[in-house]
Regions:
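A short, Lys/Arg-rich alpha-helix, primarily the initiator
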Residues: 1-24
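Short, charged recognition helix plus adjacent turn
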Residues: 1-7, 72-80
Length: 80
């Protein structure tokens, strides 16, 4: 059986949050505040995002008036 390298859901979500941050020109401190974490925690998430919680994600989405689908690459490039 072939082994498939797949990206974990938490890593995918974190990558999309970082992409959104870059596109919106948001500072690390502003991002940390919207996730209710310390700024250094962002670097921990960069290494391994498995500790990001749904509570943190929900707060981030709420503060920024986003929906989960807004973080999706496909929602911008291939609307349905």
């Amino acid at each position: 059986m072939n082994s498939i390298n797949r990206m974990t859901l938490y890593k995918l979500i974190w990558c999309r949050i970082r992409f959104w941050q870059n596109m919106q020109d948001i500072s690390d401190q502003e991002l940390a505040d919207s996730l209710q974490v310390a700024k250094r925690t962002l670097k921990d998430y960069d290494r391994n995002a498995k500790n990001i919680t749904l509570e943190k994600l929900d707060h981030f989405l709420s503060v920024n008036s986003l929906k989960l689908k807004d973080l999706s690459y496909y929602s911008h490039s291939n609307p349905r």
